[in-house]
Regions:
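C-terminal substrate-binding/catalytic lobe of Rossmann-fold NAD(P)-dependent oxidoreductases
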Residues: 6, 18, 25-56, 154-291
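Hydrophobic Val/Ile/Leu positions in short beta-strands of Rossmann-like dinucleotide-binding domains
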Residues: 7-9, 70
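Rossmann-fold NAD(P)-binding glycine/threonine-rich loop
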Residues: 95-119
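NAD(P)-dependent Rossmann-like dehydrogenase/reductase catalytic/cofactor-binding core
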Residues: 268-329
Length: 329
């Protein structure tokens, strides 16, 4: 019997394929199944011997999978998949609609408790790694301000939201941080910066033939939780140009905390940054690390939804507590 953590992937897009690659770098994990809405016979995985199962048959895999990593989009997939799968499996997901995290957590929590499973939600880099750094820096510098900047890079969640607009064939969205706002945040002066002042959003959209471009642009710019709070530019281009100039998926960003200690005379700036060649592959690597934590928590008898705030760092590592103290402390 295998002692490896048996992982399933639900959704075989950019994140799903990234998870498959990340599993290859984690010897204590193995991929046993990919779940898809497509005809399973048309899906070719990178790993030999992996079952491809239609998502409607997920329940048949309950005894074969330790942790299911949900790789759907946050706009419409995960609000349904999250609770549905949490009742059947221990799950990890990258739900990233910040404004809706509390209600999503509650829905997944109820389902996970019903199924006696562990579900860690909103895992990735933001929410995820950036969230943890916001918490650490705020706890250390309680008198201060924090600032989060994303980009320049392609946002998967916002690109997914664009592609779901009626009349859109394909699209990518770049998040662009303001250099002036970043410099002000790093200065230690604790400026007040609005959402609109910190970033702009630029969309490259391929419209379907005959689609109403004005309606598409209006829908995108007015989309709540995604574009309505930002200065957004919508560029209509051909599929060929999108494929040629916008096929890579770089991203990154900064979490900055500026605060004071003593009697306010000493200023401090904490900064955490990421520069990513592949947003989906990095996100997937975080998901796999948290799958290890979910597996361990479930083995210890825990259940319900968790966020990255609830997970002790040592649970993410394949190393023993002794190894961690010796090598990293």
């Amino acid at each position: 019997m295998s002692s490896k953590i048996r992982i399933g992937i639900a959704g075989y897009g950019n994140i799903g394929r990234g998870v498959e690659l990340a599993i290859k770098q984690n010897p204590d994990t193995e991929l046993v199944a990919v779940l898809t809405r497509r005809n399973p016979e048309t899906v070719k995985t990178l790993t030999e011997g992996v079952k491809v199962v239609h998502v409607d048959d997920a329940a048949s895999m309950k005894d074969d999978i330790d942790v299911m990593i949900l790789c759907g989009g946050s706009a419409t997939d995960l609000p349904v998949m999250g609770p549905q799968f949490a009742e059947m499996f221990n799950t990890i997901d990258s739900f990233d609609t910040h404004a809706k995290i509390p209600e999503y957590f509650d829905a997944v929590d109820a389902a996970a408790k019903k199924g006696n499973n562990v579900s860690i939600i909103s895992v990735g880099w933001d929410p995820g790694m950036f969230s943890i750094n916001r918490l650490y820096s705020e706890a250390i510098l309680p008198e201060g301000s924090h600032y989060t900047f994303w980009g320049k890079g392609i946002s998967q969640g916002h690109s997914d939201a664009i592609r779901r607009v009626e009349g859109v064939q394909d699209g990518k969205q770049y998040t662009i941080p303001s250099e002036e706002a970043m410099a002000a945040a790093k200065s230690g002066s604790e400026p007040t910066l609005t959402t609109r002042e910190k970033h702009t959003r630029e969309c490259f959209v391929v419209a379907k033939e005959g689609a109403d471009k004005a309606a598409i642009e209006k829908t995108i710019k007015e989309m709540p939780n995604y574009f309505s709070d930002y200065d957004t530019t919508v560029n209509f281009i051909s599929q060929e140009e999108l494929n040629e100039k916008h096929s890579k998926m770089p991203h990154g960003g900064f979490v900055i905390r500026s605060g004071k200690t003593g009697n306010g005379e000493n200023h401090h700036v904490i900064e955490y940054s990421l520069k990513l060649d592949s947003n989906p592959e990095f996100t997937s690597s975080v998901l796999v690390a948290y799958a290890r934590a979910a597996y361990r928590l479930a083995k210890n008898g825990e259940c319900g939804a968790k966020s990255v705030f609830d997970i002790a760092p040592a649970l993410l590592s394949p190393k023993t507590a002794e190894e961690l103290r010796k090598e990293l402390l």
